[in-house]
Swiss-Prot record:
GO molecular function: RNA binding
Protein's name in the database: Maturase K
Family annotation (InterPro entries): Domain_X (IPR024937), Maturase_MatK (IPR002866), Maturase_MatK_N (IPR024942)
GO cellular component annotations of the record: chloroplast
Gene that this sequence comes from: matK
Function as written in the Swiss-Prot or TrEMBL entry: Usually encoded in the trnK tRNA gene intron. Probably assists in splicing its own and other chloroplast group II introns.
Compartment(s) where it occurs, according to its Swiss-Prot or TrEMBL record: Plastid, Chloroplast
Organism: Jurinea cyanoides
């Protein structure tokens, strides 16, 4: 961000940002490309390498200066005479760069707010595993959970209106409207519950799509923080740090001023100091220690709140109230639940002995094996029944590359699923990947799997050791039982910031 600010000469104290002229500057395209934000966008057309990509940008800007209707006009033909490129290519270039430009004031306000509030930025909060450690610490004391799909705006114009709080440049907002209406399937962008939400527009314009989604989530979650602070005697102090990635510092004060009078008389019905919120992959969880009646009140209160004040559409029938003691949460590759673990205690008083049954709540996380096998089958490591098959397209690689690829895939999966309470699923994955690796190598050398395993079995075994197993074996070389017991423990890593494609069953 400092690199952006030095190029653009923007001062954090400025109240208005005129971003539209930056679209006509060559260096903003080069900076975005070099910064790694979208390295492939200018190079996707065949026949153009790194040296000629800047030429495309220069001629694009020249055309924008010279023509009134530009190359992005709806009346343009799909194929432009200029360099033989079609309109969609230039639309893609400009939409990606425009999204980068519009992120500048948001990022600057975020950094300024962090410094003003003295919030220490922690990368550990970005870890996916931090969600599960949070659930492990808090869900044992809760009773009910609301499964809430994130509501979507009734019209795309609402997304643009939400950005007016951050972006004061009207021209940039008009350009954003143009990109949204230019999309042929733009209605699917706002329906987050649809499998087709990643339409042709979102596939070609990932950064703009995520920018709009982030601003939408910002608007949606700011209401949660306000209601949480208003309904509890203990004000939330850590919410700002936990939500630092979605850019709504300063929004809380604005909401407090606007909505305080409207809700002050009603929120006494919802006093609940034990409300916890988690968001993941277009869905969210709201857990509470309250009763079923209280959760039902929250459910309809949120539906009317989103509809009346944010113009967000949510279907009450898709919001489910579940009791944690008999409900499992399936998300991010884990199946999480709170189970009652029976415990028997023997108590003796004088000559009489008593057996007392106690039920202890335990947070349990397992890896569902069938969705994981489905992901492996989709990637051609096994069939739908879980029987390993060779990876034919890797047969032309060297032996070391093949073994390294299979070993790395297993280590990544094992690292991500290290928080599982039961490791049986991971042993099944190791078996599938090891045998798939052996079949691939046997096919390459025109040999049988049995003969190949007999020759290279020990080498394959070493490649499929995880980091934890290596550490345990080095620490306890002679005590194998301790090593096995430690390797079965649940471990959460705070360096995992993205979900593995094979682990993502959504």
């Amino acid at each position: 961000m400092d690199k952006f600010q030095s190029y653009l000469g923007l001062d954090r104290s400025q109240q208005h940002y005129f971003l539209y002229p930056l679209i006509f500057q060559e260096y903003i395209y080069v900076l975005a490309h070099d910064h790694g934000l979208n390295r492939s966008i200018l190079l996707e057309n065949a026949g153009y390498d790194n040296k000629s990509s800047l030429l495309i940008v220069k001629r694009l800007i020249t055309r924008m200066y010279q023509q009134n209707h530009l190359i992005l006009s709806v009346n343009d033909s799909k194929q432009t005479p200029f360099l033989g490129h079609n309109k969609n290519f230039y639309l893609q270039v400009m939409s990606e760069v425009s999204s980068i430009i519009m992120e500048i004031p948001l990022s600057l306000r975020l950094i300024s707010s962090l410094e003003k509030k003295g919030v220490v930025k922690s990368d550990n909060l970005r870890s996916i595993h931090s969600i599960f450690s949070f659930l492990e610490d808090n869900f044992l004391h809760l009773n009910y959970v609301l499964d809430i799909p994130i509501p979507y705006p009734a019209h795309l114009e609402i997304l643009v209106q939400a950005l007016r709080y951050w972006i004061k440049d009207a021209s940039s907002l008009h350009l954003l409207r143009f990109f949204l209406h230019e999309c042929h399937n733009w209605d699917s962008l706002i329906t987050s519950n649809s499998k087709k939400a990643s339409s042709s527009f979102s596939k070609r314009n990932h950064r703009l799509f995520f920018f709009l989604y982030t601003s939408h989530v910002c608007e949606y979650e700011s209401g949660f923080i306000f209601l949480r602070n208003q309904s509890s005697h203990l004000r939330s102090t850590s919410s700002g740090a936990l939500l630092e990635r979605i850019y709504f510092y300063g929004k809380l004060e604005h909401l407090a001023e606007v909505f305080a009078r409207a809700f002050q008389a009603n929120l006494w019905l919802f006093k609940d100091p034990f409300m916890h919120y988690v968001r993941y992959q277009g869905k969210s969880i709201l857990a509470s220690k309250g009763t079923f009646l209280l959760m039902n009140k929250w459910k309809y209160y949120f539906v009317n709140f989103w509809k009346s004040y944010f113009y967000l559409w949510s279907e009450p029938g898709r919001i489910y109230i579940n009791q944690l003691s008999n409900h499992s949460l399936d998300f991010l590759g884990y199946r999480s639940s709170v189970r009652l673990k029976p415990s028997m205690v023997r108590s003796q008083m004088l000559e009489n002995a008593f057996l007392i049954n106690n039920a202890i709540k335990k947070f349990d996380t397992i890896v569902p094996i069938m969705p994981l096998i489905g992901s492996l089958a989709k990637s051609k490591f096994c069939n739908t029944l879980g029987h390993p098959i060779g990876k034919v397209i890797w047969a032309n690689l060297s032996d070391s590359d093949i073994i390294d690829r299979f070993g790395r895939i297993y280590r990544n999966l094992s690292h991500y699923h290290s928080g599982s309470s039961k490791k049986k699923s991971l042993y099944r994955v190791k078996y599938i990947l090891r045998l798939s690796c052996a079949r691939t190598l046997a096919r390459k050398h025109k040999s049988t799997v049995r003969a190949f395993l007999k020759r290279f079995g020990s080498e394959l075994l070493e490649e499929f050791f995880t980091e934890e197993e290596q550490v345990f074996s080095l620490t306890f070389p002679k005590v194998s039982s301790i090593s096995r017991r430690l390797s079965r423990r649940r471990i959460w890593y705070l360096d995992i910031i993205c979900i593995n494609d094979l682990a993502n069953h959504e």
